[in-house]
Amino acid sequence: MHVLGIVGAGATTLCDRLAAQLDGRVATVESLPESATEPESTDGVAAAYGLSPDGNWVGSGDDRDLDGLLDDLSAEYDYALLSGFPDARVPTVALAGVDAANVVAEAETADAADVASLAAEIDSHEPHVTLETLVERAKADPLEVYAGAIATFTGRVRAKESEDDDPTLSLEFEKYDGVAESKMDAISEELEARDGVLRVLMHHRVGVVEDGADIVFVVVLAGHRREAFRTVEDGIDRLKDEVPIFKKETTTDEEFWVHDR
């Protein structure tokens, strides 16, 4: 799922204009004042939903942050457009010079923004991918009718390797554009040549990934569990050994590139 934020006066209007230009399922997320999100009743429920016979639904709840919401959306939507989140670590369009954390385009007003250019811009950035994104992609594969197993691996940021270690606060990953993806595609194709292996999907996140967050995913669609388990293990081992991705570690005491150690 590709994500683009828009901040400044008219951000929500520009999100609506841009959504009409995108080819795929689009979700919009609007930043609301705290008072606007207070539930109408306090019946002790954490979430409330309404569902119509034709599949339309509404919902509200508590204890949700933007990253978690994007994770939930990523398996179902091709695009997410965010209105009014200047601190989000996503590519962002700034209107009228509004400050934001990651500005990739600017416009004086929402009406002056070139939506065709923004539609191309959103596709040029790293997508937001989760394990569920890849699992749903595997289930949608034409070969899934022959599959009796889906095996997955998720790598995450480990705070410590031993009790005496300085805690790791975050890892930052960088890669050469296109090179890492090409290598992962080649590994997947080689693993898919095995008997009983139908599809292999991989994704490695880039940028800053905080302690406890997910880093890398491997998903294997296979006829049976044995080839699925073997292939998911070989897949992550080969990804770590062969794909050129550079890692910087930030602990409570220091910051360093791991390949320099």
Swiss-Prot record:
Coiled coil: none annotated. There is a cross-link at K240, K247 (Glycyl lysine isopeptide (Lys-Gly) (interchain with G-Cter in SAMP1)). CDD domains: MoaE. Substrate binds at R156, V157, R158, T168, H224, R225, K240, K247, K248, E249. GO terms for biological process: Mo-molybdopterin cofactor biosynthetic process. The keyword Transferase applies. Its EC number is 2.8.1.-. Keywords: Isopeptide bond, Molybdenum cofactor biosynthesis, Transferase, Ubl conjugation. It is an enzyme of class 2 (transferase). PANTHER family: MOLYBDOPTERIN SYNTHASE RELATED. Pathway: Cofactor biosynthesis; molybdopterin biosynthesis. Sampylated at Lys-240 and Lys-247 with the archaeal ubiquitin-like proteins SAMP1 and SAMP3, which may regulate enzymatic activity. The lineage of its organism: Archaea, Methanobacteriati, Methanobacteriota, Stenosarchaea group, Halobacteria. Pfam families: MoaE (PF02391). There is a cross-link at K240, K247 (Glycyl lysine isopeptide (Lys-Gly) (interchain with G-Cter in SAMP3)). This is Probable molybdopterin synthase. The gene is moaE. The keyword Lipid biosynthesis does not apply. Disruption phenotype: Cells lacking this gene do not grow anaerobically with DMSO and do not show DMSO reductase activity although dmsA transcript is present, indicating lack of maturation of the DmsA apoprotein into the MoCo-holoprotein. Their growth in the presence of oxygen is not affected. Disruption of this gene does not affect the formation of SAMP-protein conjugates. It comes from the Archaea. Converts molybdopterin precursor Z into molybdopterin. This requires the incorporation of two sulfur atoms into precursor Z to generate a dithiolene group. The sulfur is provided by the thiocarboxylated form of SAMP1. GO terms for molecular function: transferase activity. In the C-terminal section; belongs to the MoaE family. SUPFAM superfamilies: Molybdopterin synthase subunit MoaE.
